[in-house]
């Protein structure tokens, strides 16, 4: 099985102001949305160097959750232990000023109970062939 990675998936929503940021005003800029979460990033990067990680996590039971799983599969991350549940992934909303510094952020944390259930139900199977385990749960 190789490397087991356990942790969260986040969706990062990042807004970049094109001019000096005005906290109480309207700010023109760009907004991007990307898959994030430290553990998800680690699993994808391990796969990018062809080490075949298994990712233990949860995603929301919607199209965004499906998209996260499909992207991980395209990178050759084993996703069979990922669960689709309500509040399965977090969201990080960050606002950056025109110089690239974070000026505001809000974070919605995911529910970790689905990961606990995966480990209770499948832990022996998951860890029996693991060479290494990476755990990151914020």
Residues of each region from the PLM?
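Hydrophobic beta-strand segments of well-ordered beta-sheets in folded domains
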Residues: 3, 132-133
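Catalytic beta/alpha-barrel core
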Residues: 134-138
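Conserved N-terminal subdomain of the carbohydrate kinase-like
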Residues: 22-26, 48-132
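Glycine-rich phosphate/adenosyl-contacting loop at the front of the ribokinase-like
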Residues: 1-56, 63-67, 73-74
